[in-house]
Every structure is written in structure tokens, then in C-alpha cells.
Amino acid sequence: MRHVLRRSAATLAACGLAGLAVTAAGTAAQAAPRWQDRSCVRVSEAGTTVTASRTVLRAGTNCFTVSTTNPAQPGSSSASPTLFRPVRGVSLNKLLADAKDEFSNTPATAAKGTRELNRDGRFFGLAMVVPGHPETVTENLQPGTYWIGDVASTIGAGKPAQLVRITVLPGGDFRFLHADVLVKATSADRFVPSTRTWPHEGSYLFANVADTIHFMEIVPVKNGTTDAQIQAYFNSGAQGTPPFGKIGPVGGNDVATPGNFLRVSYDLPPGTYVLLCFVADDMTGMPHAFMGMHLVIRLV
């Protein structure tokens, strides 16, 4: 659920940053990166319709190659399909109602939505993508019924959810996940990576070690941008394009539940980027990025 943002004046500042990032993203097709595995489930999004090349999987390590044909739009990524499941005893409709709370303009309702999502659902990414920059998400899944859909583009926009049912059967193999970079999302609402210099074509292991859901968007910014400048921009309440914004493709992973690990393989241009999470704080409803959950990194 990309941009789990409050639709308030302050939040529009964040949209200005993300919107500039994707305005010219992925205008030309590119060859499939070498890390794309033909055995992975191919998840594609066109409009708000998500399709999957397979809907019955074996438990254990599974991979999903995520792409979109949606043109990049100011204010959001092109697509961010989410893999999720309700916990036992919670209906799918209840979990979708929780998501609607999370997208509320009212901070108290948004905070309630975060608490509800933490309680009622389990979230497993997937990816934030723009045309020409697919990503592959690899993770370990237990048997059960899952759903894939772009909740932000449907529930978040006041539209009915469009979902694909995924059935995971027993019998697969679970493998240890490793990547070029480890990045932890913490209970202090911070990103803690093993390094702030990443390969521009590589992989990271996203580990949610927090007590709440987090996602991580990777947004390009001008070289020399600092986290202090980004925080000052959020604090200012500005709604226009930030002075450090840069046109270019974005990447990242969608919402993950505490305790979940997923490997994301990506291919983005070299340069300076900022990691962002806009999930609403479960007490105040303030987006995590406004509270300091942003980190400038370099892709080389």
C-alpha cells in the first residue's frame, strides 16, 4: 500500500517529493535485468487491475517479479501491488475496512487504521515499481490463502478493491535469504542499513524488526541532499516541489509486517536517493517520514 499518507495539507509536501521523482520515470522500455528469474511469479499491474502468472504456489521460498504499464503520475508511484492475508478469525472485508481507516484524512482515524492493520493482517510487500524498472521480491511463505492487490489505488482512492487470490500449499522448501545490503526498519521509526552506499543494480534484504508495519520507498534526490534538509522541508509544511527533488524512477517495497523479511532485487540509475516510509504513526497518525523515517543513500 504505497503512500499510506494522510490526505492533509502537510502530507501534500510528501506527495510533492514523490511526485517529482516519478514524473519522467521509465518512459522507455529496457531489457530485463539479469536477476529476473523466469521461475518467479510474474505480477503485472495495468490501471488498478493486477494479474499473476500463477495463483497456486508451494510453501517455502517464492519469488515475484513485479512490473507495470501504468504511466508515472505526479504524487505517487505507478504501481505497488501488496501481498497480504487476514489473520485467523478476521474476514477479508474487515481487513479492507482497516485499510480504509489507514487512508483517512483524520490523524486519529489513520492511527486507528495502523493499529487495526497490525492486529488484523499480515503483509509481505511486494514492490513499488514504475515502467521499465521491474523488481523481484523473494520471501518465505507459509501455507494459506493470500491476496494481491494495489490497495492504495483502490481502497485508498475510494474504489472497490481488485484482488487476486493466491493459494500456498504445503510441501515447499524454506531457504535463508541474503542480499547485497541489509536494511532494518525499527521501532524508533528509522531505517538502519548495513551501508549507505548500495549497488545501483543489486538487492537488499528488508527486515521489519519494529512493532508496526513499515514500507520503504526509494526516491531520487539531487546530489548533496542531506537528511537535515529533508526534515526541514517536512517541518515547513511546504506543499510544492522541494528544492532537492530530482526527476527519475523510484523503487522500493510495499508494507511488511513486523518480523517479516523480504529480498528485493532492483535496477535504478546511479545517484543519490532517499529512503522514505509514510505509514501513519499508530498513536498520532503522523506519517513516519515526518517523524524522521528518511535516510539519504547513494547508488553507485
Question: Regions from the language model: what does each represent?
Answer:
Residues 1-31:
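Secretory targeting and sorting signals
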Residues 40-41:
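Short, positively charged
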Residues 190-195, 204:
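Short helix-to-loop capping/linker segments positioned immediately adjacent to catalytic or ligand/cofactor-binding
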Residues 35, 44-45, 49, 54-59, ...:
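Extracellular/periplasmic metallocenter environments
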Residues 131, 234-259:
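Tryptophan-paired
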